[in-house]
Amino acid sequence: MKERDFQAEFGKRNLITGVFELKFCKKTSIRFDSVAKHQEAALLAVEGDGLYHKITDQPFLKDMNFQRKKPFDCFNLAGIPAYIVIMFWKARKQKNVYYIPIKRWCFCRDAVGRKSITEDMAEGEAMFTEDYTAKGNK
């Protein structure tokens, strides 16, 4: 499994409303700096006063002049829950997904005195947890 597989699975299974930064971890921990500063700032803005973003017009394939249909031109979101969503993956074992609110993520990053978050720590910080081991859809 790769991060793109997690992205596809998340799209099928997620029932929670909000904005999400997805992270995929095959190790015992994931670095806090895997969430870039601009991503963190955007997630905090969405939970707060708002974030405006224009969706770019991009070709579906390189060197092609036609474009993928986009749902709309832009959005302005405010007061929306924002999460870092981490899947801790181990081959042929349970695949746990943790929804950590962005403010909890920032607090944990600043308070724990280490550079990464373990699965046990993520479980303690998560607002929601899901098991993606079994195949399933919405």
Where are these regions (language model features)?
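Conserved catalytic cores of phosphodiester-cleaving nucleases, focusing on short active-site segments
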Residues: 12, 17-27
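Charged phosphate-binding loop/patch that engages nucleotide di/tri-phosphates or the phosphate backbone
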Residues: 110-138
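Short connector loops at helix/strand junctions that flank enzyme active sites
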Residues: 17, 38, 77-79
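Nuclease catalytic cores
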Residues: 1-13
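Sequence/structural signature of beta-propeller domains
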Residues: 33, 68-69, 102-112, 116
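Nucleic-acid nuclease catalytic cores
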Residues: 47-104
